């Protein structure tokens, strides 16, 4: 019979510390969800869901774009509603400057954001034209970051964007993704690649770019 495998004491200590930290983090996240903490709730990336948080610089750049778009509104422009698709790390910064923001996410941890959270599953988009019907034609700005760099994911993301736009000619769209998606994206939405390059807290292997149906670069400072 093989001898039992045992870890060196220092390795075991590191492992136990890691497990303790993970347990604490999970407990904190569960508490935030239960208490509907709101925009101050913080969560770790879940790589299994292809979650990668934006850098502070990128979050602030996109927040400032939203601020400028809001400043262009007139008193008779009506409500300005914002949808964030699969980009939860943007939520806090955008929510701090505007009240009407919904975060569309598959990850139910973000129920901590209360009524601003909308659970959605891209797999339900193609088979059901009434999916999320209460949100159809409700949004003036949509910022999306599709979770996967696949043709199917881009097609479904474009479909839900089209449904959510209040007015397809006037609603603004910003989409951040890997450059590889460009032919699939531009075949489905009237967007162009911008000079603005979103960055993440952790460097990604794919070349990450942005697309928009308006001149996004004019709104980006120090691009």
Curated annotation (Swiss-Prot):
Keyword Methyltransferase in annotation = yes
Family to which the UniProt record says this protein belongs = Belongs to the class I-like SAM-binding methyltransferase superfamily. EFM5 family.
Q: Identify the enzyme class.
A: transferase
Q: Which cysteines are disulphide-bonded? A: none
What's the source species' lineage?
Eukaryota, Metazoa, Ecdysozoa, Arthropoda, Hexapoda
Q: What does this protein do?
A: S-adenosyl-L-methionine-dependent protein-lysine N-methyltransferase that methylates elongation factor 1-alpha.
One matching Pfam family is: N6-adenineMlase
What protein name is recorded for this chain? Protein-lysine N-methyltransferase CG9154
Give compartment(s).
Cytoplasm
Alphabetically ordered keywords of this record: Cytoplasm, Methyltransferase, Transferase
* The enzyme's E.C. designation: 2.1.1.-
**Record InterPro entries:** DNA_methylase_N6_adenine_CS, Efm5/EEF1AKMT1, Mlase_EEF1AKMT1/ZCCHC4
* One cellular component (GO) term of this entry: cytoplasm
For molecular function, the Gene Ontology terms on record are:
nucleic acid binding; protein-lysine N-methyltransferase activity
A single BP term in Gene Ontology: methylation
- Is Heme among this UniProt entry's keywords? no
